[in-house]
Amino acid sequence: MINFNTKEKMNMTDKLKSGERLPEITVPRLGGGTLTLGTPVDDHDWQMVVVYRGKHCPICKTYLAELERVAPEFATAGVGVVAVSGDPEDRARSFTDEIGVSFPVGYDLTVDQMRMLGLYVSEPRSEKETDRPFAEPGVFVINAEGLLQVVDISNAPFARPDLAGLAKALKFIRDNDYPIRGRLAA
């Protein structure tokens, strides 16, 4: 097993909370420029940030292909979509080119940035998988006020929100001024 000697470990209480602002995180964007997570890059006033594990993950390939398929439903709901991973540019580019995504994709998310997002971070099982720690999946929906409307993180690749259902739910939330849920302190 690769040991990356990560000194600071995230506590379970370091997770982002609904109703908070997404930390300001800027990463390089495929195609040039940068991508600031939580800041819409198109004519939508909401943004959904999908954090994927990386090129080594076959489930991520299926998930991003599904995101590409349902991206128009998110657009109808007024939500722009972006994806980001800790992969370097070459791996992110070959992965997304293989899938054929049209939405913005960021890369080189650092371990510190992953922690700022409250994500679970894993070490690769071998160098064949990848050469660096990577984020486990996360989905963040940021509303027009810049607040986290929806927060969904997982510690494994197998549990992720259904994208078609989420697009319909976000349309309902917007059409009905549905409040941010899960704000009561435990």
Task: Kindly label every feature range from the protein language model.
Residues 2-186:
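Chalcogenol-based redox active-site neighborhoods
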